[in-house]
């Protein structure tokens, strides 16, 4: 449901004007489609989980009776998305030479989400999601993403003479991204069954005190001067940006039990985690702020009437403020193979130079055939959350306690300390204090957290070299018919990536025998301190120059009659990168990308957010009777991009994000790729032969983000009718509208619906399981029962956003 208004008009005739627009939208959605089973048997096609009604009710009752916690329903979940927008603008014609525009924007967007699929700390991440055929969670474990934006702008345009003009633009933006929940403060609890997620409850483990607050000031002044056949523009730009990041993963506590019986009996949990602020601070925050000063100049040179060259040069200086940081000397003393991490310093001041040149050539001199293009360096930004990861995980603001059997033993206790049930957040914090975990910290002493984040002192903001070439052709027919062919190429110069400095180089590691000969990480794969204790993971933000991309597009525009406009366009896109930075937490970004040689050895792969093929066509009709028709057809491939992976950790690096090797038929036949049984081999190879990606990439490791969802086809229709009215001698207009999205779906529920990964395969494409190494050093594999030659890779995505919907509108324009 959408409600909106638009109003505008003069405050002072021909001098001062106002405009306002508001919209309130409430969109039905389904954030969790899964439901509990009666018999413990999952049915992925029907979105029935193996988690039973009886077990879910038992856990909910125990949570209420034993701990006073309300889990919420396991059959009804919050889901509706809400969006509120407001725009207000004042335009002032000060005089003939000066115009001022003031604008205010407000946006609030709320979207509900199921709990994080499987991320956790202190142990092995499960392959099955917490809401899936394997597991269920409760309504109060859902969370909302609330995006709030306030922005103001002051835009003054001045003309001082026929050859000299100026634009002064100042903007202020306040952007707040926060999480909401219906849960009371309570630890998040995972209960496993058969070494897989089964039931989860509590406040979502990444929601408490999770917010990013960005404040941005931007001021620029551009002077434009015309002289002869040159248009020269010179400008200055100043930007100040500050980000406060609040991020307490496991901020209310985290428990993981290996079985339902362990939870019911109050047995020792497998893992306990808590992140807390020092000195009793319940809402710790980390801050990064920088100043950016830019100077740029550009010359548009009309060399001839049919040939124009545009050349420009931009200088950007970036200056970080170290005043919000403290060096953790305990971290600084750690020796990562001769490298040390100073969490009290941002990257040094840097200067980026970006030259650019472009041209436009009217080849025939009559605007019927144009060649245009350009090349240059372009700089961008990086979300500041990747910087605030350093103070957040620098051990000076908050402490991340991750307790399991191994590190408990290192500290001189056992997991039996946590027998007897779940402690409240405050009681758990006190328990950790009693076990020797720090309550306060001094910079000169410092402490070593479970994991560390840092930024390379020489880190630079992203920069690419971009080149393009295009041809615009007007076809010599009796009506306007234009064709444009364009190609764009991008080469990465500086992109952001993460590396774990604690990991040793894989050169020299033992490898499996056979076709899948990936390295095997030994027990001493990480660097150690002088006492022989493994150093914590050190996630370092660095630069890489690896990566490129290109796209080609063809666009046709035609107007065969005055009352109709036609358009068609096709775009093919390729993007290769080292990482898409999926997420905001450093460990998630690094560890949750499929690889076969470990987290520091990513190969170039397809970008996560790429739609490789897209075609769109439209027809717009406007007749003399006030009727306006619009028909849009769109089809694309991709949008849901997956990576074929193993169900478990084959290389021993501690992360279950290992790409599968796709064997050839010969490698399977001659035993260089081995299965534990003939049945596993037959079912897997039958699936390979029936899946186009696997079949076309046999003999290779599966590339991340390369399993693209199939083509989807959509048609949208719009009709508007204008009623011209004469009210008290003034011309008014009343417009009625009818819009229908995804028209095909109205006629057939499977038409116009995109496809995503078949739930029978899982929410991640894990189609093989490592079963150990045989006596000859070959890795052996089994195939999940759901995988065979008849298994469909894709299934219809039954989501509200895939359905048709229609809207009726009314608009009244008056003078």
Residue ranges and their predicted role:
Residues 2-114, 144-172, 355:
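Transmembrane beta-barrel wall of Gram-negative outer-membrane proteins
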Residues 324-354, 358-540, 710, 728, ...:
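Solvent-exposed loop/turn elements at secondary-structure boundaries
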Residues 484-643:
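Gram-negative outer-membrane beta-barrel transporters
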Residues 434-446, 626-728, 735, 760-798:
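Extracytoplasmic gating/loop element in the C-terminal half of outer-membrane beta-barrel translocons
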Residues 12-15, 97, 162-163, 225-231, ...:
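Short loop/turn motifs that connect adjacent beta-strands in outer-membrane beta-barrel proteins
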Residues 20-24, 102-106, 168-174, 234-240, ...:
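Transmembrane beta-barrel strands of outer-membrane/channel proteins
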Residues 1-5, 84-88, 148-154, 170, ...:
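Hydrophobic, lipid-facing positions within transmembrane beta-strands of outer-membrane proteins
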